[in-house]
Amino acid sequence: MVDALKRTGLDASLSNGNFTVFAPTDAVFNAWINDLGYADLAALQQGLGTEQFKSIIAYHILRGSNSSADFSSGYYQTMAINSAKDSLHLYLEKGSVLALNADALVIEADLIASNGVIHSLNSINYPRSVYGLIEVNPNYSSLEAAIGLADGNLKATLSDEASTFTLFAPHNEAFDTLVMRTPNVNNLLELIASLGTANLQNLILYHATGSRMLSSGLQTGSVNTLANDGSGGNLQFFINIGSEVRIIDNSANTEDAVLGTRDIIGSNGAVHLIDAVLIGE
């Protein structure tokens, strides 16, 4: 990790301020180099490209000093940035061990440095797309399952690095509420069966836009989604900004969705968490 920090110039950035570094072990770095077919770290950097290599390394660093006791499960901003220069987030799950993006586990915690804390990792932690940031959060497993079962290969769509998205993501409880309100439906799979996979695709796309929409730029008004209105256009929802940010869908039978945690940044856009499933009918 020390060599990688020097190669990217991040060692200079870490010399001023307090930081938390999730550091893959030397064995992890060696396995990474070998798995990708390179001779050494220099060859890996050249093969990936300087910017991508730096982004991966910076994705292991948080600003501020955080011991393992300081963490709770949630999204954390890293020092990596995407093409829009927004700081990327990772998802940390705090259980018996700390897990980053459901893959990289902390195997030795709380190594105290002069200007922060180091936590040792058992694997490389890669930046995630807007889909990837939902995929790794167990509180959004219903949305993740719906994306996987819908027509149109939405997983690949929302992971596409050549595109930009904003995803308004309802949590599991929101899907549970929709299940309860849908006649003759008892669980998520029955809900999906009642909708059909084509309608499910449009339902998911009603929660996404094809542009970067950070909370600082949200205004009261209509927003075009990626959902098809059946006439060659796109369905819209309405944002109402007051004491809360509310999203009003096209159904009279559902409650407004309230915007919760916002500006969770992925490699290809942003995620905002909401508390209701939006219906575009």
PLM features: what roles do these ranges have?
Residues 1-281:
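Mature, structured domains of secreted/extracytosolic soluble proteins
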